[in-house]
Curated annotation (Swiss-Prot):
Under oxidizing conditions two disulfide bonds are formed involving the reactive cysteines. Under reducing conditions zinc is bound to the reactive cysteines and the protein is inactive. The keyword Disulfide bond applies. It comes from Pseudoalteromonas atlantica (strain T6c / ATCC BAA-1087). One of its GO terms (molecular function) is unfolded protein binding. Belongs to the HSP33 family. This is 33 kDa chaperonin. The gene is hslO. Disulfide bonds join C234-C236, C267-C270.
Length: 297
């Protein structure tokens, strides 16, 4: 049984599209990058599943980011995903707290969900919705109802065991081209949403995807597309870090090297550290750094 895959399907008679995503290795890679407490682990799993689901709705090459921001215990959490299902993410919270609240609404004070879509060609689009619902899934449903007036159902669940972590998600939405697209009370959609709500955790986390879809929708006319593989992939590199340093005055960089012994840059997503010494600084500002560092660390 394969996790780290997204399955897309279509209800031909109801003009509704659906998605099922299950994450394991890709999710665990994010958790391994930092010592996140259980509450944050669960949050990142739900956010990662949601990002994968929404990434699959893109009609172009590009990426999408789901970011939660607030003045509460969780400052922000973000997952970035590309059109080909490469995901990465990070969260920041008040680490001075001895214990974080487990209730979603208590994690975010004056919180907002920001969804940013960035095509490789074209203008970036950004939408937002308040984090004023009991769950992240309901906040995402609210986003689609407000911004696109599309009936949408989202299910997000996580599982933590001694053998590792898993995150799953399901997504139903009336097709934008459907005549019922703006009818949030469409009976066909409501019927499918109620069927989807019957999914049990043990089914989501243990059954093959084909069995899940059959159990839920065996009486429906459904077309299933080939699955898409999902991986954790950070876009950081030594060269990109060097490009950022090129915008800083050379003298300032040399002062840091003289004081600290080296310039240290850490990726906020994978927490990989890149170090630059005096020779690197001279190469960066001479425009020869890429040539000098073909054997990247």
């Amino acid at each position: 049984m394969s996790f780290d895959q997204l399955h897309r399907y279509l209800f031909n008679q109801a003009h509704v599209r659906g998605e099922l995503v299950r994450l394991e290795n890709s999710y665990q890679s994010i958790l391994d990058s930092y010592a996140y407490p259980p509450v944050i682990q669960k949050l990142l799993g739900e956010l990662m599943a949601a990002t994968s689901l929404l990434t699959a709705t893109l009609k172009f090459e590009g990426d999408i980011a789901l970011q939660l921001q607030s003045d509460g215990p969780v400052n922000y959490a973000v997952i970035n995903g590309t059109h080909d299902q490469q995901l990465r993410g990070v969260a920041r919270w008040d680490e001075s707290l001895a214990e974080l609240p487990t209730d979603f609404s208590q994690l975010f004070t004056k919180g907002i969900l920001v969804i940013t879509i960035t095509p490789e060609d074209g203008e970036r689009y950004q939408g937002m919705v308040a984090l004023d619902k009991p769950t992240l899934a309901e906040c995402i449903e609210s986003y689609f109802q407000q911004s696109e007036q599309l009936a949408t159902k989202v299910i997000l669940r996580t599982q933590q065991t001694d053998s590792g972590a898993k995150a799953c998600g399901m997504f139903l939405q009336i097709l934008p081209t459907s005549s019922q697209a703006t009818a949030t009370t469409d009976t066909g959609f409501e019927h499918l949403a109620k069927l989807t709500e019957t999914i049990k955790n043990e089914e989501l986390f243990s059954l093959p995807a084909e069995d899940i879809l059959y159990r839920l929708y065996h009486q429906e006319e459904i077309e299933v597309y080939p699955p898409a593989d999902i991986i954790f992939k950070c876009s950081c590199s030594r060269e990109r870090s060097a490009n950022a340093l090129a915008a800083v005055e050379k003298a300032e960089l040399l002062d840091i090297v003289a004081t600290e012994g080296a310039i240290k840059m850490n990726c906020q997503y994978c927490h990989r550290e890149y170090r630059f010494d005096e020779i690197d600084v001279h190469a960066i500002h001479a425009g020869t750094f890429a040539m000098d560092t073909q054997n990247d660390q």
